Amino acid sequence: YAQGNQVDVSSYKDPWEYGGDTGLKNLTASVKKLNNMSQSSVRGMDISSYTALKKAGVKYYDFDGKETSLLKVLHDNGVNYIRIRIWNDPTNEKGETYGGGANDVAAGLEIAKEAAQYDMKLLLDFHYSDFWADPALQKVPKAWEKDKNDTEKMKQNVYDFTKDTIKKFQEVGADIGMVQVGNEITNGMLDIMPDYSKGETYKDTWGNAKNAKILCGYLKAGIKAVRECTPKALVTLHLESMGYGKCSEIMNAWERNGVDYDVFGSSFYQFWQGNSSKNALAGLQKIENLAKSRGKMYAVMETSWLNSLKDADGTSNVIGEGHANAKVYSDDPQGQVDALTDMYQTLLSNDNGLGAFYWEGAWIPVKAGWTNWKYNKDMSDRYGTGWAAQGAKGYYPDNKMYYNGQPAWGGSSWDNQTLFDSNGYPLQSLKFYKDSVSKGKEQIIALKIVDKNGKEVYATQYVKVEVGKTRKITLPKFSGYYPKNKNYNMTLKGTQEGNTVQKVVYTRTAAGPAISYNYRVKVTKKKYKLYKNFKWKKSKTKVYKKTYVAKYRYDHKNGNKYLALYTKGGKFVGYINKKAVKRLGSATQPEQGKAYTYGKRVKIKSKKYKLYKNFKWKKSKTKVYKKTYVAKYRYKHENGNKYLALYTKSGKFVGYINAKAVKVIK
């Protein structure tokens, strides 16, 4: 009736309440071709709840209204990748399911068998937990609980479970294209997590050397199993955060600990990224560029958008009518297409961008209509079809299982973000995955930039080339190396779909690459010359006894090390032999160094030392000779002197003075 159709209003029943046709499947959605969307772009979907839903009797239909396999509907409409979450043992001691799709290995294998019939690739998403693993909770599997304080046993557990599971998927004919080692591990995994009650953050896990080493050991154990079982599969590490600084710090921890992976992945939900699609997409581009700078491919591991703000099964949805950012796009199939279009255009603008996975795009109610909430709850308790089931009580935290003292588990909390209506009919937005494709199959060539010994000297470059075509590229220019004949132009040919590796040998310059140094130095020896460049053109600048910032170090082929000197203002001065200087403090730290707690009463005994307002040596007019103060802090300045910060008894700051000027009094 609301859509302009003639109905008998006296007998009309709200379809959201009673489970009839909501009209969503009839809403149009316009899809445009995307310039960089190829047949090989990852157009994936997580359908982990499918096995549980199927057991409960849920049916899916094609666009002709014919009942058919969910995998066939997805395949026929352009979805080429399926993501499956894997939990170790999502049941309690009575064998009752925790819900959430009941995603043990057996449930995943059922999906894999069906996907194999339609030549769809799989991404295996290892949570290394018995239930939901996310930034808030990363619980050790029950069977591993006894080992959680034994790092070596835990690494073996991770390795064995990963390897055994992959082999089982291979045995049913699964085409494993990607393996995700850990799920949304922003704050840690396997119970190595921040103590939120103490205000701890990811910095206390990934930023803590001991914790990071253990965590990276677990990642490396899982990755080792992947490399051994399915060497062509791409290893993916997944953070929920879109924060540039946070992602960069965590990637640094992985690099320091030698974690070998191929793809950096993020969760990208626009309703949690702010109220501006422009800002969210700019953030997405920054994270993709971050992955590129580290020589990694990039993919969105989870995304979605709303088909409606309505609830269709009696369990409150994650995003509903009161959500602040639910209007970034329209809440209908066209809004879903628009959200996917913007995201894919951003993702595929870089050659390291693979594509994305739509999260739980088919998690519809078992029985549509929120008046059927009890039936949906019962089905969840029996088959695990809801986000959680009664069997998870006592295992999953009460603050998640209950809301205002009432059970919050039962049905799907995602039914208004699917690409199907509540009765299993596809929405027009599903056609995005087929209709947006504008190119044929692609080859992704990973260019490894190496020296003559095969050592990588620069971040891996990724180039997409359409199969059967050629593409001209410009090789990267960077300090210390150059390609053969200094020719930076290269032509690549697409010969096969998939990922291949090609090495490009660079020659080292005599000076070599610029190595970050970043110390203040004082030139203490006159016999060494200052040079404008490494062609040994001398500089006339007088540097003896002066202090500079040495930003970079060069290990020259002549056996000497040279420093690139800069003024404090950042102006380049020249290159000088490292033996000519005395190293002072780090350029990232103040010249006076750290403030050490001192806390002693002192009396000024000498008049020859000046009092300063700051360490830029601005003199104070305050008369302090023969007066008594509290020296709260002591500084070891890189000029060789020690200074004290003086305060009055009432706590007022007075100034800084050389420690030789005072006498400690009791």
Region spans (language model):
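N-terminal carbohydrate-binding accessory modules
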Residues: 7-77
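Aromatic-rich peripheral "rim/lid" segments of glycoside hydrolase catalytic domains that contact
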Residues: 23, 308-339, 357-441
